[in-house]
């Protein structure tokens, strides 16, 4: 991935939505653009900047002369430094309060105090931080929107307006959540024939005609049409029909994933220390995995936002215990809503020789470890794609947003996943974990997962890979003025 020889250094400002699952892919992309010759300014919120310093150490965000970290406020009142922020509040705050601080930051970057820094020449913004388009237009620079969802999740959001128009949402009353209404199949969304209403991004399951998240999705998908281009962390071969459907209704769309494979070309050691985990990682997990047989461990991690009830936690625990499989289970400090995650002492005693509990881990390294044989996941897009990159089949327990859509594609199109009922019961956990790890269906899924891994690697190859060649096109868009 040779760096382009830029006559004068171009300066890309990268601004992710301030949540873990959005910061990770944006930082990968920023490192790739830096490798391509761009000066990078990476913009975190002040809240997340503090969290990163706490989890990664006081020098973690010193950056480099041409890769700097800056902050803007998120507009929310202060909260517990280790808690995941409330998503609707954060969406409302970024939409209404972040444009002026972002404008001020751009003015500072272009001002006399930044004489050693080239002027801002392009913006790469998270797809749901579209207020930045206004600032890009004022500066007269191109802006690319990076939707960090799957293509299928993004297409689901793009159809919210049509779902409202057809009267499918908001729901008439709360009984529609459980009376079979959400099970109906839709045959009119291109690239998603026969998807059930329940498999579309979950914000539509509201009875409130003024639901904020629905309004937010409508606003962000409408503004997406104003971008110079849209990029997605996926690859053409995985979501071909969906990407073609998106391309028919939006500005140029470029699939540049999996970014974790494209990033392998970046050999700059100075960049490898720049990480993005908001929780302190426990790398001891990897030492423990080294002592396990290949394909013998179930990895359990519900991501950075999922919360569950104490009852659900206990059902997962006993399902894992009763499966008799070896497991590595990541339990965030705030995994149980409004409570601390307390596991039954009997469970801890029974599984002490075959289970390891940790609060956070370096997930890409864990998933690519030969000991991992399956992944019990919330189906967030980063986790799903990292699982695909490692050739690991999944049990899917989606929590919210487009995770349900990712789950549907895993289970019905890609054949590398099994769905677990939202109303989790230990018997189902036990039977699915057993099937995944030692059953015939599990073996078929493992084969399919390895096929997808190979296709992902092909897409990222510099010799003709679809994502690699799209990345070159993205660079050209960012260089255009």
UniProtKB/Swiss-Prot annotation:
Its EC number is 2.4.1.324. Keywords: Glycosyltransferase, Transferase. The keyword Glycosyltransferase applies. UDP-alpha-D-glucose binds at residues 148, 363, 378, 381-383, 386, 402-403. It is an enzyme of class 2 (transferase). InterPro entries: UDP_glucos_trans, UDP_glycos_trans_CS. GO terms for molecular function: quercetin 3-O-glucosyltransferase activity; quercetin 7-O-glucosyltransferase activity; UDP-glucosyltransferase activity. It catalyses: 7-deoxyloganetin + UDP-alpha-D-glucose = 7-deoxyloganin + UDP + H(+). An anthocyanidin binds at residues 22, 401. Induction: Up-regulated by methyl jasmonate. It holds the Pfam family UDPGT. Disulfide bonds: none annotated. The active site is at 22 (proton acceptor), 126 (charge relay). Gene3D superfamilies: Glycogen Phosphorylase B. The keyword Heme does not apply. Ubiquitous. Very low expression in stems. PANTHER family: GLUCOSYL/GLUCURONOSYL TRANSFERASES (PTHR11926), UDP-GLYCOSYLTRANSFERASE 85A1-RELATED (PTHR11926:SF774). Iridoid glucosyltransferase acting on genipin and 7-deoxyloganetin. No activity with 7-deoxyloganetic acid. Involved in geniposide biosynthesis. Belongs to the UDP-glycosyltransferase family. This is 7-deoxyloganetin glucosyltransferase.
């Amino acid at each position: 991935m040779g760096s382009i020889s830029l006559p004068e250094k171009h300066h890309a400002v990268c601004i992710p939505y301030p949540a873990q699952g959005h910061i990770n892919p944006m930082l990968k992309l920023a490192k790739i653009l830096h490798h391509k010759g761009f000066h990078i300014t990476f913009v975190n919120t002040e809240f997340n900047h503090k969290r990163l310093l706490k989890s990664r150490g006081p020098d973690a965000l010193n950056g480099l002369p041409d890769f700097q970290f800056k902050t803007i406020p998120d507009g929310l009142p202060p909260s517990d430094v280790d808690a995941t922020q409330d998503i609707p509040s954060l969406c409302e705050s970024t939409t209404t309060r972040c444009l002026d601080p972002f404008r001020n930051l751009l003015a500072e970057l272009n001002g006399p105090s930044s004489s050693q820094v080239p002027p801002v020449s392009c913006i790469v913004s998270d797809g749901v931080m579209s207020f930045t388009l206004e600032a890009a237009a004022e500066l007269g620079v191109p802006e690319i929107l990076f939707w960090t969802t799957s293509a299928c999740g993004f297409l689901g959001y793009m159809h919210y307006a049509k779902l409202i128009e057809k009267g499918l949402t908001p729901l008439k009353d709360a009984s529609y959540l459980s009376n079979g209404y959400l099970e109906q199949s839709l045959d009119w969304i291109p690239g998603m024939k026969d998807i059930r209403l329940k498999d579309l991004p979950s914000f539509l399951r509201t009875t409130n005609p003024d639901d904020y998240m629905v309004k937010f999705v409508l606003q962000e998908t409408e503004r997406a049409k104003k971008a110079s281009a849209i990029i997605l962390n996926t690859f053409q071969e995985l979501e071909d029909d969906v990407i073609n459907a998106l391309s028919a209704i939006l500005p140029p769309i470029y699939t540049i994933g999996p970014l974790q494979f494209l990033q392998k070309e970046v050999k700059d050691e100075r960049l490898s220390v720049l990480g993005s985990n908001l929780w302190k990682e426990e790398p001891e997990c990897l030492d423990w995995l080294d002592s396990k047989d290949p394909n013998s461990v179930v990895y359990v991690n519900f991501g950075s936002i999922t919360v569950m009830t104490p009852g659900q936690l206990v059902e997962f625990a006993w399902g894992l215990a009763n499966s008799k499989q070896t497991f590595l289970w990541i339990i965030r400090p705030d995994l149980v809503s409004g409570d601390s995650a307390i596991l039954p002492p009997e469970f801890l005693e029974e599984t002490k020789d075959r289970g390891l509990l940790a609060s956070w881990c370096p997930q890409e390294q864990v998933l690519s470890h030969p000991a991992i044989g399956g992944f019990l996941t919330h189906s967030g897009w980063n986790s799903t794609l990292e699982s695909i990159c490692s050739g690991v089949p999944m049990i899917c327990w989606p929590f919210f947003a487009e995770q349900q859509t990712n789950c549907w594609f895993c289970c019905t199109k890609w054949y590398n996943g099994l769905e677990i009922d939202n109303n989790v019961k230990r018997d189902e956990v036990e039977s699915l974990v057993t099937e995944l790890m030692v059953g015939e269906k599990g073996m078929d899924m493992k084969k399919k997962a390895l096929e997808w891994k190979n296709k992902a690697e092909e897409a990222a190859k510099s010799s003709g890979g679809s994502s690699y060649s799209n990345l070159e096109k993205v660079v050209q868009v960012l260089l255009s003025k």
